[in-house]
Amino acid sequence: MSADFAPYWQQTLDDLARYPARPELELLPLRCTDFATLYSVRLSSLGPYRLFGYLSIPTGTGPFPAIYYAPKYQSVLEIIPQGTANLQRSAYVTFALAGRGQRNADTPYAAMFPGLFTEGIDHATSYIFRGIAADAVRGFEFLLARPEVDSARVVVVGNDMALITAALHPAATYVVTTPALFYNTVELAPKTQAYPLEELNDYLRAYPERLEAVRATLAYYDLRAFAPRLTATTLLIAGAAGPLLNRQALTPLVAALPGRVTVYDSEQSSYKDGLYIERWVAAQCGIPEVQRILPAHWQ
């Protein structure tokens, strides 16, 4: 962990606070159903930079539990994750956010994939993920301000950015995180040729003289540094026995988390993993009859 980890992130949050969110919502009738209403959302983040998201609100009387889909490492934003049943929107307020560079939030910066992970990585103050982390916090603030949301039942879901968001904003009650980018990155990347970590290998082959600068930047983002700040009940998705980020590799991260933690070993099946996550989230949020919101092919 960097010696000035806390000041770095406090400065990021202070800088973010200087920019009002100024949200604009637009009804999307084509994506509305009899059980949920969908809006596109535009709001401002650090920069200022204009972001995009999808907000879905269940029909009926709230407040409802909420799921926040933090920005992913992919170009396209989904309303809910591919493969998830649309009926999830009948039980939860859902908000999915595109961070800067993702499609619909790609003006003036359109990210490349691969490419986003290493954008500005040799300078901590200009690293693109400083802005993306601020974006994730801003989206979470927007969701929490919605009157339809039960603030005691808010789940942040995603990769590393889910854990980072919940560590930077204490209001998350539950977290589902699948580490992929920011765990012991410089040491683990040379052991794989799989993306996204191979992107770092590509970068350091091109710029080997920047290794120590990259290491210094990534010290601000390592999940082990964020872990002590996390108060939410956490579901951590570990890789299967073979991959780098398996249960054994993630043991130091689990040990650093102060709250209740469940570690789930991925079965490398979107069905099996998705079913476990849906049931875990429903149990935490007190959603009865979870079967009714599962995809038909999962039942």
Model-derived regions, located:
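N-terminal targeting or regulatory segments adjacent to alpha/beta-hydrolase or S9 domains
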Residues: 1-36, 289-299
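N-terminal cap/lid segment of alpha/beta-hydrolase-fold proteins
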Residues: 19-61
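Short substrate-entry loop that stabilizes the transition state in hydrolases
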Residues: 60-65, 69-106, 185
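Cap/lid segment of the alpha/beta-hydrolase catalytic domain
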Residues: 84-134
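Gly/Ser-rich "nucleophile elbow"/oxyanion-hole loop immediately N-terminal to the catalytic nucleophile
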Residues: 117-157
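Hydrolase active-site cap/lid region
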Residues: 162-208
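Short beta-strand/loop motif that positions the catalytic acidic residue
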Residues: 229-230, 236-238
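C-terminal catalytic histidine-bearing segment of alpha/beta-hydrolase fold enzymes
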Residues: 251-299
